[in-house]
Amino acid sequence: MVNFSVLPPEINSGRMFFGAGSGPMLAAAAAWDGLAAELGLAAESFGLVTSGLAGGSGQAWQGAAAAAMVVAAAPYAGWLAAAAARAGGAAVQAKAVAGAFEAARAAMVDPVVVAANRSAFVQLVLSNVFGQNAPAIAAAEATYEQMWAADVAAMVGYHGGASAAAAALAPWQQAVPGLSGLLGGAANAPAAAAQGAAQGLAELTLNLGVGNIGSLNLGSGNIGGTNVGSGNVGGTNLGSGNYGSLNWGSGNTGTGNAGSGNTGDYNPGSGNFGSGNFGSGNIGSLNVGSGNFGTLNLANGNNGDVNFGGGNTGDFNFGGGNNGTLNFGFGNTGSGNFGFGNTGNNNIGIGLTGDGQIGIGGLNSGTGNIGFGNSGNNNIGFFNSGDGNIGFFNSGDGNTGFGNAGNINTGFWNAGNLNTGFGSAGNGNVGIFDGGNSNSGSFNVGFQNTGFGNSGAGNTGFFNAGDSNTGFANAGNVNTGFFNGGDINTGGFNGGNVNTGFGSALTQAGANSGFGNLGTGNSGWGNSDPSGTGNSGFFNTGNGNSGFSNAGPAMLPGFNSGFANIGSFNAGIANSGNNLAGISNSGDDSSGAVNSGSQNSGAFNAGVGLSGFFR
């Protein structure tokens, strides 16, 4: 379970302020006080009755037998008195724990104050266009670190007080030495059973599920604690297949992500590689939008930093399709331009070529264009600063679509290259919002995945944070199945390794899991290559494949995902070649469907470096 010393103040303060508080402990103390009073009264009454019978004026008990009975009754009176003292001690220690809690709560930072600090930090970062907020950002972070330290110090004090109170409690079985000798065997049996049950409860890890390694998990196959979900490696995740902590979603690698398939920290979105992104498919940090490659971009498909608009290449551009720095407008190539389709620097106008020009130079400043506002060459469309584009607002080259800062994309808002789809900052993907490379699917930040929401590599399925899995929500590696936190399992909910079945926290002996596999380190069915290793799924040959019936080249690794691929590093269905993503492509380094040649995107293209369709 995650220790409080590594948890941020949002978690520690929230638990202390929004939990049950000291009320239940004070109620327990009152109950122990009541029990102590009742036991004390019973002990006093029992002693008075016994002494009255034995030594009263009437001498109700006489003879040797009566004397023996008086002697036998004395330990019971002593037991009642000792039990009353133990109950009173428990009440005192319960009050001490409640007092320690109240002292810690008073020393904790109010969650409202923590939230205000984080909100101010985000606002400062988003508005830090020219770096003017750097001192304020540093001050906010310093204050946040002080909050973290204050919360940890308060929790250390609480832990010390509670531990001291627990240590002061005397075990109940030592309250009356020798009492068990006075009881018959029938009475001893329930006591022994209760003691065994108590020991069993103490050893119980309190998981609601199977195959967990850790405590307080609500789910199965987790390695860690306080997860609500299955197949997580880490703590306090709300979802499945995460590798890390405090994630709200599935298939994340990192901490505090609210979404799926992220690699990094605190991303509210999916398929991001980096931290603090509000959107999907970004590579970088603190972007508000999707498909950006860089930092602090406000829009989509930018390649650079602090751009306000889409499809820009460069920094500090306001508009779309610009290639350069500090341009205000659309389709400019250069820096400091204000307007449309200018080539050069510090121009104000439309279609100007050169530096410091003011006016209207033409529909386009480039050559061979059909359209308006193009500063590049051989474009068909509007406001393209790159070359050979069909569409608008493209700052890259050879794109079919709009808002692409990368090259040879078919789609829109792609900052990477050779993508078929939209919102991808990675390269060679088929789908949407992929931050990784050569994926066939969506929201993947890893590479060579077939599916969606994978932050690992070479998976066939979805929400896998590990590598080379066939299935879903696996945080481990080379699993065939679902919700596995361990490695090389065939089945589900396994926190251990090399299991064939469900819900095991153990590591089994053997080279492979599953059925009919040869080689080493394989899971699934019928992976029959004697020299193969690291395969998951069904009927694969080679190394590192996931999915169904993939074949790597002889004596070389495969690392394919999907179905019936031949070659290496392919993702999708029936591809033949290398680094292909999609369906039925042949050649190398292409994405899409039924392309032949190399470095193509789209569908039904034959050649080199083509985007679009039927070219």
Curated annotation (Swiss-Prot):
It holds the Pfam family PPE. GO terms for biological process: response to host immune response. It comes from the Bacteria. InterPro entries: Mycobac_pentapep, PPE_dom, PPE_sf. Coiled coil: none annotated. Belongs to the mycobacterial PPE family. This is Uncharacterized PPE family protein PPE40. The gene is PPE40.
